[in-house]
Amino acid sequence: AMALSPTEDGQVAEGDFATNLQKIRYRDGKINGYPSRLHYIADWVNNGIRNGFLEDVTTAYSPYTQRVSLSYMSSHPELYKQLSKSPENVAKMKEIEKSLNGQEFHYIPKDKLPFNGLPWIKNGDIIAITTNTPGLDVAHMGIAFYVNGKLSLLHASSKEKKVVVSKVALGQMLR
């Protein structure tokens, strides 16, 4: 969806899709091997803010923070085809993790998210769901979507194996 978003002048050119997708998925829009892809959401958010296509609205509204401590990919290379046989890629991922570690990100605790959402969360906003899994920052992502006044999540459901709008409010889903 972001790759098809209009430019500031309201235009969307068909040929821009691949270029926009590359800007969104790769560090500063440059493909330079597997580690240049934005695997961690903390890295993706930093890149998006730096390159002007994301805004972190949670920072302005939530006092709750957590520090990033990433290591999952470099400590589980066997789970990634492009890392399992490439010590060089593992070393690069470890450097990337180290560069992100210690950064502070704002979040909303699940017990502080009302079923009807928050006034500053709008339809189409990107929602990242944090995790307690050691070495990871985010467990799941989706798009904010209000249904009958309740904040829902448009997301790729692993259970339903397709993109769905959550049947219950996001606040309820997280509890």
Where are these regions (language model features)?
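Acidic/His-rich structured neighborhood in mature extracellular/periplasmic domains
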Residues: 1-102, 128, 146, 155-158
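Generic detector of bulky aromatic hydrophobic side chains
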Residues: 44-45, 114, 142
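Short alpha-helix capping/helix-loop boundary micro-motifs
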Residues: 106-117, 131
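Short, well-ordered loop/turn sites that connect or cap secondary structure elements
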Residues: 120-121
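C-terminal soluble interaction/assembly domains
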Residues: 125-175
